[in-house]
């Protein structure tokens, strides 16, 4: 079927002229038309096939051709124009969508039109009644829509699902819809919202969550286009929020022009994990169904982008933040995917329709149904509902509404004038179960029915004709009356009461799913009793899915089928595929799995692993291979949404894959190299054509799991298009990597590179060195090798101390939400000089200001210099040093509107103490350096490396990136924080005293380290060291300073390339 549009406008045409080459094109302005048209292909562009229905006052019109006018030819944006001779006087018809994108304004006073910030003179055309040749595409006056005695041709279309009505019903319904035309939403209209209810996100803590996915460069223009549309609609705004949820770009079906469409999805799973559940009661389905019995008319109503018509609470707006490559945004309307969104929608509709509930209509989550016994009563009820929705400023999606139905499906039941009937789809999978013809099929069927044998009296006797066919050398005769009778009776028994029960919404639901090589199966149950069985076959693309993809597809399909039972309730999913039990903990799922995880985020469930032998019901349903005539609509729907012909993007560097294909511009050539155990193919090309791309895919990808790298997005689109043809051959997954690192070929080169960087950055630790190396270079087993190299660094062994934690229990404290909210200060002394040290807690940006003495006046002057450089914080935290506890300093800070918070006695300020320890280490390292210039400016060197060149473990960014350049920290999730805390507390119990520290009673101090570190270390000869600590000299043998070797270290002989 093609697309269906309407075209309406004012009775008198008006047009503008736009210059194209040497011609002045007459462009008709039609604010009522949802399509653009051109009388002829004056642009010499390729003609596209389409099937578009235009409804005019002269009747329906089908247009089969269109052209796509690229950007900058006529307008800054790309637009589709239907190719049809709609008029002899005009060249183009500009519809509502194009006018909206162009931010068009029409000034009748000045007689001009503004499009894309360009002004055009508005010219009055020929009146409608005088123009015989004009085909009335745009000649349906707006006034006609308001006349109750005339029917708009828009409403006569089957687009609005009115084909089942007789003439009287259609006439009266159309009159009602014309009366309430203001609540109808059409594509391109600005979406309104209600202020009846606001959605609030209450979280367990106020720690900002930050996570981000990268999306392909090829999607960037589409993403920004949709972002701009939502900004224009007022759905989102730009944001400064510390929160960030990742976005995912999901491909949709192509439009009639063949252009690929996409949908932006926000992954709110992390936010949902810390969101407090909304306990708003969900209506009892039995009570709702009880009120719908024996009605003659039913209407189901769908709100246009329902969630986006509800306003967000201002206090919760910041928590909905997300980011693209070009900006940070937050929702002003309720987005899809939030945990409590269904409950808020239910509350909102209850408040709006409360006077009408149970009498004229019912609401269940996002389903609204109007019911009555007669046509007059039903139209009256619809009018009352429309009136309430209009007052609440809500809009309807008419093409998704069903009006005046005498039989409809609602909440899994079929509503008819004769009463409520169970949905036949609940047992369709059982009724269509084919008669077993092989022993394996008999076992599967008896496993399905035998699962409920405790509810079937004399099960063994009934099943005997089938069980005896399992004996050795026993022939299976499906025409045997006893065999056929046993099969049919068992199917009947498990499809009827007392086995198949009516759902009890006070009890927990269990959804059991399974997938085989050919089909999917699922059963919804409570307390062991089945409520509904479903199964379907896999389409030609789904058969190629991996096992975990098929298993997850079964869950996605089943939750969609049983959505009216499961949405808004906690339930359990049982699966015999164990990897699904840690679905949300996968670190690198592919695009399909990630997209399906996002789809499941609106449900509240736990995944439970069960053994395969316990999953006999869903397993049997998943092994039914139905004939083509039995394929359900859901199967076809899955086929429509399938995108297995797409090459997905991965964040993994190309170098990590065993089979790598690199496309580069240059004289045509192909080079194949080996890098350790990895196979690398480098393809040089001058122009990427469809034919070349197909040959490359067949020669280098088919039958081989590979990853490719290509810089040009335009050339990648050619490969993507050719991939659809190559997919029919023996196929395995292809990924596109956007990261290509430089390969290091030998261990000697690798070690030299690590040592150089390690020394240049003042000897950072293992993790920081590994991250720094991994941003640019690749070498197999680099992490273990870097650990080995750094552990053998003599300067690190001498200058650094172990970072042990105090033995007090660690607890999370409220984190600041932005820079300059909270500073920590302390006095730092080194080599006879004193400094006021300061660190911004949010960004970890640090600075030092030298002072002559440690009194409050010097500290005040130092703080003034710090405030001039960094700005004033809201809160200043310090220990109880005499200068900081001074009443005079406190009063000065109060006058500056800065709150001073002092720690309790004998406790340090953790972040600032850790900074001091880092500075001490770096200074000791600098002292061992031969660079005299560095020694003279050591404090400046340390601060420069700390602030600008070292990524902090907590934020994942350099302090300067966040503090000076408004970058966003990459914060850990609450679960990761709790895991780290538990590990720290466990390590305190199990650690051993390092021999680098003096043996004796443990001495606790302000530092995180509970031991007193050495103050001054000197090497007396090749085997001995002298330690001076508080004027006490102790001699040690050199082995006491060496780090213990880790069990998992690689020796040089094990390293690649040696």
Swiss-Prot record:
One of its GO terms (molecular function) is endonuclease activity. The open reading frame is located in a copia-like transposable element called 17.6. Its EC number is 3.4.23.-, 2.7.7.49. GO terms for cellular component: DNA polymerase complex. It catalyses: DNA(n) + a 2'-deoxyribonucleoside 5'-triphosphate = DNA(n+1) + diphosphate. CDD domains: RNase_HI_RT_Ty3, RT_LTR. Keywords: Aspartyl protease, Endonuclease, Hydrolase, Nuclease, Nucleotidyltransferase, Protease, RNA-directed DNA polymerase, Transferase, Transposable element. One of its GO terms (biological process) is DNA integration. Coiled coil: none annotated. This is Retrovirus-related Pol polyprotein from transposon 17.6. Residues 231-415 form the Reverse transcriptase domain. It holds the Pfam family RVT_1. The active site is at 30 (for protease activity). InterPro entries: DNA/RNA_pol_sf, Integrase_cat-core, Integrase_H2C2, Peptidase_aspartic_dom_sf, Retrovirus_Pol_polyprotein, Rev_trsase/Diguanyl_cyclase, RNaseH-like_sf, RNaseH_sf. Residues 810-967 form the Integrase catalytic domain.
């Amino acid at each position: 079927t093609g697309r269906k549009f309407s075209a309406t406008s004012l009775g008198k045409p008006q047009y503008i002229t736009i210059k194209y080459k040497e011609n002045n094109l007459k462009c008709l302005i039609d604010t009522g038309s949802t399509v653009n048209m051109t009388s002829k292909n004056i642009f010499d562009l390729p003609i596209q096939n389409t099937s578009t229905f235009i409804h005019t006052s002269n009747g329906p019109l089908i247009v089969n051709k269109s052209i796509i006018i690229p950007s900058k030819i006529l307008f800054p944006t790309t637009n589709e124009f239907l190719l049809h001779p709609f008029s002899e006087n005009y060249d183009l018809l500009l519809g509502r969508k194009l006018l909206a994108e162009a931010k068009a304004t029409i000034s009748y006073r000045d007689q001009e039109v503004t499009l894309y910030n360009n002004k055009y003179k508005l010219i009055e055309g020929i009146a409608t009644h005088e123009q015989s040749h004009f085909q009335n595409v745009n000649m349906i006056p707006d006034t006609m829509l308001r006349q109750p005695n005339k029917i708009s041709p828009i409403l006569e279309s089957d687009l609005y699902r009115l084909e089942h009505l007789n003439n009287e019903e259609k006439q009266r319904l159309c009159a009602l819809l014309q009366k309430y035309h203001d609540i109808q939403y059409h594509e391109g209209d600005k979406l309104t919202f209600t202020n009846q209810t606001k959605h609030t996100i209450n979280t367990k803590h106020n720690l900002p969550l930050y996570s981000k996915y990268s999306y392909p460069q090829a999607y960037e223009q589409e993403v920004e286009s949709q972002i701009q549309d939502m900004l224009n609609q007022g759905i989102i705004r730009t944001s400064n929020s510390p929160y960030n949820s990742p976005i995912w770009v999901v491909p949709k079906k192509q439009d009639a022009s063949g252009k690929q469409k996409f949908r932006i999805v926000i992954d709110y799973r992390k936010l949902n994990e810390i969101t407090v559940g909304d306990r708003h009661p969900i209506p009892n389905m039995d009570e709702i169904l009880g009120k719908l019995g024996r009605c003659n008319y039913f209407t189901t109503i769908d709100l246009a982008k329902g969630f986006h018509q509800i306003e967000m609470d201002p206090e919760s707006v910041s928590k909905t933040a997300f980011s693209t490559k070009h900006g940070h945004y937050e929702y002003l309307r309720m987005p899809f995917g939030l945990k409590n969104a269904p409950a808020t929608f239910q509350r909102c509709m209850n408040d709006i329709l409360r006077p009408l509930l149970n009498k004229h209509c019912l609401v269940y989550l996002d389903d609204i149904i109007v019911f009555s016994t007669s046509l007059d009563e039903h139209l009256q009820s619809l009018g009352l509902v429309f009136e309430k929705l209009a007052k609440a400023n809500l809009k309807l999606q008419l093409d998704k509404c069903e009006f005046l139905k005498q039989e409809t499906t609602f909440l899994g039941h079929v509503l008819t004038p004769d009463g409520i009937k169970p949905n036949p789809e609940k047992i369709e999978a059982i009724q269509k179960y084919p008669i077993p013809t092989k022993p394996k099929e008999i076992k599967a069927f008896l496993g399905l029915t035998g699962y409920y044998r405790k509810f079937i009296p004399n099960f063994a006797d009934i099943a005997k004709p089938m069980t005896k066919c399992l004996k050795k050398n026993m022939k299976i005769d499906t025409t045997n009356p006893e065999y056929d009778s046993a099969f049919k009776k068992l199917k009947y028994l498990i499809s009827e009461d007392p086995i198949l029960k009516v759902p009890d919404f006070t009890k927990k639901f269990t959804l059991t799913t399974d997938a085989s090589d050919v089909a999917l199966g699922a059963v919804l149950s409570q307390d062991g009793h089945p409520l509904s069985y479903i199964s379907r076959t896999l389409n030609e693309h789904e058969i190629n899915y991996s096992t975990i993809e098929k298993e997850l597809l079964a869950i996605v399909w089943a939750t969609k089928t049983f959505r009216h039972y499961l949405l808004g309730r906690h339930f359990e999913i049982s699966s015999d595929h164990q990897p699904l039990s840690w679905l949300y903990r996968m670190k690198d799922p592919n695009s399909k799995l990630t997209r399906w995880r996002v789809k499941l985020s609106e449900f509240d469930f736990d995944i439970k692993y069960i053994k395969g032998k316990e999953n006999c019901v869903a397993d049997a349903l998943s092994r039914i291979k139905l004939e083509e005539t039995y394929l359900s609509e859901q199967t076809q729907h899955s086929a429509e949404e399938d995108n297995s012909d797409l090459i997905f993007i991965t964040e993994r560097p190309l170098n990590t894959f065993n089979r790598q294909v690199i496309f580069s511009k240059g004289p045509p050539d192909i080079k194949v190299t080996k890098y350790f155990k990895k196979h690398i193919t480098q393809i040089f090309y001058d122009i990427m054509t469809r034919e070349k791309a197909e040959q490359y895919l067949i020669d280098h990808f088919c039958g081989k799991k590979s990853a490719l790298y290509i810089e040009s997005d335009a050339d990648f689109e050619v490969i993507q298009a050719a991939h659809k043809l190559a997919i029919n051959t023996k196929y395995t997954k292809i990924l596109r990597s956007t990261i290509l690192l430089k390969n290091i070929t030998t261990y000697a080169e690798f070690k030299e590179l690590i040592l150089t960087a390690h020394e240049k950055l003042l000897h950072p630790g293992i993790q920081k060195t590994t991250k720094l190396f991994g941003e640019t270079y690749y070498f197999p087993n680099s992490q273990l090798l870097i650990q080995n190299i750094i552990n053998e660094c003599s300067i690190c062994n001498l200058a650094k101390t172990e970072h042990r934690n105090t033995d007090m229990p660690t607890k999370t404290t409220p984190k600041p939400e932005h820079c300059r909210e909270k500073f920590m200060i302390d006095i730092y002394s080194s080599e006879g000089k004193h400094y006021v040290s300061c660190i911004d807690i949010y960004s970890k940006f640090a600075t030092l200001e030298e002072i002559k003495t440690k009194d409050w006046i010097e500290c005040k002057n130092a703080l003034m210099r710090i405030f001039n450089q960094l700005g004033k914080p809201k809160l200043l935290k310090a220990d109880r040093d005499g200068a900081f506890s001074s009443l005079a300093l406190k009063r000065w800070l109060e006058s500056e509107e800065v709150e001073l918070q002092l720690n309790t006695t004998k406790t340090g300020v953790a972040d600032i103490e850790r900074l001091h320890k880092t500075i001490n280490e770096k200074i000791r390292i600098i002292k061992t350096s031969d660079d005299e210039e560095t020694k003279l400016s050591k404090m400046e060197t340390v601060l420069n490396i700390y602030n600008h060149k070292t990524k902090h473990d907590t934020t994942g960014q350099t302090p300067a990136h966040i503090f000076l350049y408004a970058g966003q920290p990459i914060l850990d999730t609450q679960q990761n924080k709790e895991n780290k805390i538990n590990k720290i507390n466990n390590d305190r119990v199990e650690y051993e005293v390092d021999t680098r520290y003096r043996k004796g009673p443990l001495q606790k101090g302000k530092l995180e380290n509970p031991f007193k570190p050495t103050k001054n270390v000197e090497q007396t000869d090749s085997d001995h060291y002298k330690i001076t600590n508080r004027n006490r000299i102790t001699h040690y043998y050199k082995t006491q300073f060496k780090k213990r070797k880790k069990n998992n270290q690689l020796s040089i002989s094990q390293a690649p390339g040696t």
